[in-house]
Amino acid sequence: MCAPAAEGKRFQPAEQLSFSAEDDGVKNPVVIPRDVLTILSKDKLVREELEHEGLPAEEIPSSWFSASAIHLSHANAAYLIVMSVGPVQGANTTMFWAFRPTHSGHDLIFTGGGHTLTAKNTRWNGYREIETLSVVMQKLATVVYRFDGTRYTRYKDKLEEIK
């Protein structure tokens, strides 16, 4: 009788690299740390929704977001991709944020909106490029972001007819 190759090893789900506004959340959710929620509460759209709901920033509902652990760099540390799934989400579009772990918590290194976010296999400064897709004026808008050493910045935009 042959034993499975992975016998004795814990199953680790594949890392999610693509996130969509059409999904109810990420595929392998992780708990969103309190310091990340605090940073999210300072985002303009989130702050406006907190005011609309009559909630103080300290009571930001974690149910408004879904987070997944991802390796954006070659480091062993797991970064977080957070997507809005609650009232901050729009029609067929959502907000995405990426956080880098630090000794004292997390740093916000990406903010962007769209229908889809993909962490690409191509890298810049050791970090995966991030690509967002959205539909604008009945055209497909693609934006590629690159890590500049501190945070992700817009690198390339493309607007094309939907095929």
Model regions and ranges:
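Structural motif
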Residues: Q89-W97, Q138-V144
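Acidic/hydrophobic-patterned starts of short beta strands in beta-sheet-rich repeat architectures
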Residues: H71-V85, W124-L133
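A short beta-strand motif characteristic of beta-propeller blades
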Residues: G54-E59, D107-F110
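Acidic, small-residue rich beta-repeat scaffolds with periodic aromatic anchors
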Residues: M1-R47, A119-K163
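Short, exposed beta-strand/loop patches in secreted or surface proteins that constitute
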Residues: A67-S73, G114-N125
